Amino acid sequence: MSIFLKFFLYLFFITTLFSFEQGRVVNTEIIEYESLEQIQSNIINELGNVGIVSQYGATIYRILYETLDGYGDSTVASGVFAIPDSEQEAFGIVSWQHGTQIERQSAQSNRGFDILSRAVSSSGFIFVASDYIGLGISNDIHPYILKEPSASSVIDLIRAIRNYFDEDISICLNRQLFLIGYSEGGYVTLAAQEAMENDFEDEFEITISFPMAGPYDLSGTMVDKMLED
């Protein structure tokens, strides 16, 4: 982490110690922009001509936002969001929950575009992805397969994105919300879905949820396995 970023986070902590708000935007910055032609070329180079219909160039941003850590205390997490290059339409949100990562530096907020963020944003959706607590900018312990902090990192990022677009009238959101995750991200997706449906039903309306290949009952499965003859 750079000295400047450490200093910025320290100042932020001091000035907001008594004004914490889940989903508050701390900072945003552009990581990179790719034109429609660049996105099409990069997708073809990586996947071949698989029929992905790109319609827009896109810009991907790094975002810092307020959320809760594994102990229920306030903290700052990082993530990304990518915006289609158009001010004429209202776009839905696609929230991607990534699989298991073991290094903070491998977080998407340190990498910018990948094939999924290119495909989603160039097709006319707002792509968002949390690094999770303990990855990316966060120095906290990563709460691996813990329901509440996993859900909070996703829900508060979506809140932060909505807050950001509320202040930027050039970008409009529609009501569509897609949750997609694989491996650890499958678990995180289901945790976020459960919290949205049970605790925040007036705030979120999920269009479709795709939790894939997640360890949904890790403790229960391991207990049965360990007690086998």
Predicted regions located by residue number:
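Alpha/beta-hydrolase-fold enzymes
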Residues: 197-229
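Short, surface-exposed "cap/lid" segments of acyl-processing enzymes
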Residues: 70-78, 82-119, 137
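Gly/Ala-rich beta-loop-alpha elbow adjacent to hydrolase catalytic centers
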Residues: 181-185, 189
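Alpha/beta-hydrolase active-site loop
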Residues: 144-167
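A fold-wide structural signal in alpha/beta-hydrolase
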Residues: 93, 121-131
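Gly/Ser-rich "nucleophile elbow"/oxyanion-hole loop immediately N-terminal to the catalytic nucleophile
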Residues: 83-90, 160-180, 200-204
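Glycine-rich "HGGG/HGxG" loop immediately N-terminal to the catalytic nucleophile
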Residues: 134-143, 165
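Catalytic-loop region of hydrolases
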Residues: 20-89
